Each structure stands twice: as structure tokens, then as C-alpha cells.
Amino acid sequence: MDPKEVLKRLTEGVSLSQEEAKELADLIMEGSIPEPLVAGILVALKMKGETPDEIIGFVNSMRQHALKLDLRNTLDTAGTGGDGIGTINVSTATALAVSSVFPVAKHGNRAASSRSGSADFLESLGYNIQVPPEKAKDLLSRNNFVFLFAQLYHPSMKNVAPVRKVLGVRTIFNLLGPLTNPAGSERQVMGVYSLPFMRKLAEAALKLGYVKLVLVHGEPGLDEVSPQGKTYITEVTGSKVEEYTYDFSEIIGQPVPVSRLTTTDPLDSVRRVLMASMGRDEAVEKFIRINVSVALYTAGLVSDFKDGFELSEELVRKLPDRIETLVRDNGDPSKIKAIKGSL
């Protein structure tokens, strides 16, 4: 494959096959293409519009180059990020809450465009995010939760990171993170920053082995379930795709403005989540609970979002103790104790 020829084709609007996309991604992952050419290819893909086959090809390459695990009977809540709104770490809080009743392998990274990434949030709690493959399975079996740090499990991404940083725009790699959990989680809630990508990601997911994937995009532009307006939902169940909208104000009553859910940094996000779990921040509590309701539905533990919302109250109330248990087994519990003591 000649990368220059690929760039020429992409600029002419010609899409790649799944096999071609994987071969191209392999070359990028291996550092075999000069950075200026990689930048051109990523921008050309973006301008043309990434197809499901191109996404699948890149996903398969990333999975092949990742450190390997087999923890398929798990749930993940990793999303695309990049909505630019800066809400509290609701997907990570959701993962922690749901892990009380279903095994969770949370895939995540440090903040790129947000104020607090999942890795930053967990570190602020005292959780050790550097969990190698040889320890991940035992940690999951003991605690029903493990965090898989993207920088550790996708070492080949170091060949792409400088280009992505210089470009400063979303590329195909923003879509790949949530689809490349090294655990191979068969169930996932995936927040998507852009509504047009929902269908593309769903079509790609049909060929990626999910038992249940629920993609969500909430008004006004959230890559999460929205407490303010409608949430656009695409369910992938085996070979079936279903699209619909849901207004969670039917469950929570008065809508919650997104402006009440923003955070300034990881520690602030941690404090807001803990306050919510203690019943002292109603807006954040509702935000977490509706996201937990969708995760419980995705895990197959409830039949609808309303039942999930009812169960979520108990799980959210248990969060402080749940977090302390997880951190005590893998991290520095003095951090979470100090934060709890300051609230």
C-alpha cells in the first residue's frame, strides 16, 4: 500500500474498503508513515466522512496492536468525549455505581478536550489506574470493577499522539477509543458527541461482536444521557438496530439545565459526585441516576429505563463506600477518606 496514493484517493472522495483501512491503520500504528502524511490522511478521511467499513478497519487494527485481555462478560461506559461542555465525570460515576451489581471493565484515558478524563477522576479518588493485564482479571474477579488505562493498553497510539495534538481537530481516532476496549466488553453504553455519527458507529458495531450496545446523544449536544432535553438513542442488539428518542424528564420530573452539571477539574468532579451520592446535589444526582438507568438496561438487569432509575437510587447512595472499597484494594484510600472528610 502506498500511503501517498491513499491520500490522493481520499481527497478525491473515494472511500477505503475495510481491508484497506486496516492495512492503512497498521502502517500508522507501526510508525511507518511520516507524520505530515498521517496528518493529511486523517484530515482527508474527516473531510470525506469516515464510513462504517473504514471505522471497522481502524478498530480491528487498534485491537490487534493492543495489549490483550479476555473479559468479555463485562460492561463498559466509555464514550467518544469531545462534546466541549465539561460536565462532571458521569460515565465513570455510572461505571462505579453499576459495578455493585454487574462486572465493569472501564476503558478510559486522561482528559483531551474535557476538564476531567476518567483516568484523572479515578486518580483523584486514589485509584491506581496503572493496572497491567496480568492483574486486571484478578482485580475484576475480586471487585467486579477494573479500569483499563488507554495509554497503557494501546502503546502503538504513541505513534499517532503527536499528530493528533498538532492537528487539534477531531479525527477518526476520536471514534475508535470507545470501540477498542482491550477487555472486549460485550455490553456498552457509548456517549457520542455528534448525532450524525450515531448511525455510522451502529453500523460498525454490527460487525464488532457486541451483545448489546446503546449509543446515546443528549440535548443540547451531550455525549451522555441528557437531563435537560431529549436523548437520541440507538440500540444495537446482535444483528438488530433500533433508533428512538427518550425524554428523561418523564422519570426525573423537572428538567435539569446542563449548566448545573459542569465541573472545573477532576477534584471538583469527585466532590460533586460524592455530594450527589449523599443527597446534597440534586442536579448531579439526577444526572448520574438517569445514566445509571441506561447502563442497567444495557447490562440486561432491568427491562426499561424507569425500572433502572428506581434501582439507581440505592446504587448511587452506596457510591462513597463502594469507591472506598475499590480504592482500598487498588490504590491509596487516604485520598478518598480525606475528600469525604472535607465534605
Curated annotation (Swiss-Prot):
GO terms for biological process: L-tryptophan biosynthetic process. Binds 2 magnesium ions per monomer. Mg(2+) 1 binds at residues 91, 224. Pathway: Amino-acid biosynthesis; L-tryptophan biosynthesis; L-tryptophan from chorismate: step 2/5. It comes from the Archaea. Coiled coil: none annotated. Anthranilate 2 binds at residue 164. The keyword Transferase applies. Keywords: Amino-acid biosynthesis, Aromatic amino acid biosynthesis, Glycosyltransferase, Magnesium, Metal-binding, Transferase, Tryptophan biosynthesis. The keyword Metal-binding applies. 5-phospho-alpha-D-ribose 1-diphosphate binds at residues 79, 82-83, 87, 89-92, 106-114, 118. It catalyses: N-(5-phospho-beta-D-ribosyl)anthranilate + diphosphate = 5-phospho-alpha-D-ribose 1-diphosphate + anthranilate. One of its GO terms (molecular function) is anthranilate phosphoribosyltransferase activity. One of its GO terms (cellular component) is cytosol. Belongs to the anthranilate phosphoribosyltransferase family. Homodimer. Catalyzes the transfer of the phosphoribosyl group of 5-phosphorylribose-1-pyrophosphate (PRPP) to anthranilate to yield N-(5'-phosphoribosyl)-anthranilate (PRA). NCBIfam families: trpD. This is Anthranilate phosphoribosyltransferase. The lineage of its organism: Archaea, Thermoproteota, Thermoprotei, Sulfolobales, Sulfolobaceae.
